Structures are given as C-alpha cells and as structure tokens.
Regions:
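N-terminal switch/interaction subdomains of large nucleotide-dependent motors and GTPases
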Residues: 1-119
Length: 119
C-alpha cells in the first residue's frame, strides 16, 4: 500500500483530494488539513485535478456511503483522521545521522505534533 501511496505518478487515494476541498470545513479543522493539495507530498506527486471527477461531490458521496454502511460519526471521524494522518506522515523528512545507521527527523517536528494531536 505504501508503494501505491508514494510512488505512482497518478492520483493516489481519492479521499486525500476530497478532504482537501474544504467542502466540509469541520473535517479540515479536525484533521488539521489545508485546502491546498500541494501542501501534501502524496497528492502533489500525481494529478491534482481530473476533469471527470468533482472532489466536492465525491466527498459527499463518500460521507453518505459511510452512513449507508452504518458508521456512526465517531467511526467516520476515525477514518478521516487516519486518512489525514497518512497525508501528514507523507510530509515527514529524515536525515541520516553521520556514521550511524539511524535517521532523525529533519525539521518536521511541527508535523509530528500534528500527527499526535489528530490521533
């Protein structure tokens, strides 16, 4: 799955783009997401917009699908938070420690804090 998210030169998971529309501001606020998909590495690697896809309408359809499946609001929020966590995690950067086989965060402490707050 990570390979699909990270390395395909196409749109990855549509929910990422749907959540960046700002159509449901409560999702963006809860998940600490901007409405600019270019702020997220995974989205910016592929097509941002596709003529045949209206991400605003698709977000409504996704949310309604969760309702049809019987998810309550807490469960839906959990899905949105997990999806947002993947988006934020994609922006994490690491640098190798000199002469060691370890890595350390490379200026992403703010993003790490967001991940902890979301989850």
């Amino acid at each position: 799955m990570y390979n699909k998210i990270n390395f395909q030169a196409e749109r990855c998971f549509h929910i990422f783009y749907q959540m960046c529309t700002g159509h449901k501001p409560e999702i963006n606020e809860m998940c600490m997401l901007s409405t600019d998909p270019y702020d997220y590495k995974y989205q910016s690697l592929g097509e941002i917009t596709v003529k045949s896809i209206d991400d605003t309408e698709e977000l409504d359809a996704t949310d309604e699908s969760f309702d049809i499946l019987g998810f309550d609001q807490d469960e839906k929020n959990g899905i949105y938070k997990i999806s947002a966590s993947l988006m934020h995690a994609g922006n994490a950067k690491f640098r190798e420690k000199p002469r060691e086989e370890q890595a350390e965060p490379d200026g992403t402490e703010v993003r790490n804090k967001r991940l902890r707050q979301i989850l």
